[in-house]
Amino acid sequence: MSAIVDIIGREILDSRGNPTVECDVLLESGTMGRAAVPSGASTGSREAIELRDGEAGRYNGKGVLKAVEHINTEISEAIMGLDASEQAFLDKTLLELDGTDNKSRLGANAMLAVSMAVAKAAAEEAGLPLYRYFGGSGAMQLPVPMMNIVNGGAHANNSLDIQEFMIVPVSQPTFREALRCGAEVFHALKKILGDRGMSTAVGDEGGFAPNFGSNDECLSTILQAIEKAGYRAGEDVLLALDCAASEFYHDGKYQLAGEGLQLSSAEFSDYLATLADKFPIVSIEDGMHESDWDGWKLLTDRLGKKVQLVGDDLFVTNTRILKEGIEKGIANSILIKINQIGTLTETFAAIEMAKRARYTAVISHRSGETEDSTIADIAVGLNAGQIKTGSLSRSDRISKYNQLLRIEEDLGDIASYPGKSAFYNLR
C-alpha cells in the first residue's frame, strides 16, 4: 500500500509573478510527488473557483495562503493514510470534503495541487513515468502542438481582439520534427517583425504581441513566416485561432475594437467563415460567447465539418456542460484545462466523454503557468492527440515541450505523431 504520510502545501509564484499553490505528497516508502497549479487570465464564468485571499495589501489580493492552509489542515487530515494509487477514491474524498458544486470552499487550486501531487507520488512509487501511469501500455501517441506565436486580447497589450494566433505543424513524422518546425517559424516571424520595425516583445504565453492593423494582416504575416522558414502553409503547417469571444462580447454584439466592427452572432459566424476560406485554418476556439449557444449552433452548422470548433469557456472541462453540448450539436471539440475542474479524475472523465462522442480533446496550459509539466504526460497518457502550451519562448512553456521530447525518446520506435489525423472528425 502506497500510504500517504505527509502533505505540504505552499505558496509559490507563477509565470506572471502572481501567487499559486504547490503541494508535496510524501508516501510511506519515502517517495514524493510535487505539483504546482496554473491560473488563467480569460476565464469561463462556470470554471471551478480558485481560492484567493483578497487582501489588498498583499500581492494585490491574489495571495493563496487560505488555499495552502486548507491543504495543510483539512485536506491533510482527510487523506492522511490513504493509498495514493487509488486516485478516483482520493479525488472523491476531496470532492466530498469541499461539498460545493464549484469547489469554492476549499478552492480548486488547493484540490488540484493535491490531486496532481498524489498521482506523481503514486507513479514514482510504481516505478513508472507519469504518462505511462496515466495511460498504461496504450500510451504511445504524441500530441500535435498548437503553438501560439502571436498573442492578442487579454494575453497582450496590443490592438488585436483575437487572443491567440497559432501554427499547427502537421506533415512531420515525429514530434521532435514538429517542434523544430514551430521554432523555425517562430524565429522567421521574429525576423519579419524586426525588419518592419514592429515589436518583438512577447505576451503571457510567449508569442509576439505587435500592433497589426487587422486579423487579416496578422494571419498573412504568419503565412509569410511559414514560407520564409521553408515550409508550405496549408500542407506542412496549418493555422488555428483562439478568439476568446466572451472577452469582446458586449450588449449582444461581438465588438472587434481593433477593426471597428460590431457584429451579431450570424455576422461574426460569417466573419470567421471568411477567415477560414481565406487562410488554412484548421481550428477555432471559443468562436462565440460562452452563453451564446444559438451563435454556437450557427457556427457549428456553418463550419463544423471543415474546422475544429473548440469549446473552452463554453465547456470549462465539465462533463455536465459537455454532455449538453454534445446533445445539442454544439462545437466538435473540447479544451481540457485541469484547473477549470479541479481534480484529475474529473479531467480524465471529460476527455473520455469527448472521445466517445467523436469530439476531439485538446490538452491546454493556462496563461499563468509554472515549470510543472504534468499536462504533457496527460496528453500522451490519454492519447489526446493535441496540446496547446504556448509559443517557442519562456521556460514555463518550453518545459512542456521538453517533457514531450523526453517522452518521445522514452517511447522509442513505438512513438507516433498523428499530424493531420489528429483532426479526425473533419472532412
UniProtKB/Swiss-Prot annotation:
Its main location: cytoplasm. Pathway: Carbohydrate degradation; glycolysis; pyruvate from D-glyceraldehyde 3-phosphate: step 4/5. One of its GO terms (molecular function) is phosphopyruvate hydratase activity. Binds a second Mg(2+) ion via substrate during catalysis. The gene is eno. Gene3D superfamilies: Enolase-like C-terminal domain, Enolase-like, N-terminal domain. Catalyzes the reversible conversion of 2-phosphoglycerate (2-PG) into phosphoenolpyruvate (PEP). It is essential for the degradation of carbohydrates via glycolysis. CDD domains: enolase. This is Enolase. The keyword Transmembrane does not apply. (2R)-2-phosphoglycerate binds at Q163, K337, R366, S367, K388. Transmembrane segments: none annotated. One of its GO terms (cellular component) is cell surface. It comes from Burkholderia thailandensis (strain ATCC 700388 / DSM 13276 / CCUG 48851 / CIP 106301 / E264). Its EC number is 4.2.1.11. PROSITE patterns: ENOLASE. PANTHER family: ENOLASE. It catalyses: (2R)-2-phosphoglycerate = phosphoenolpyruvate + H2O. The active site is at E205 (proton donor), K337 (proton acceptor).
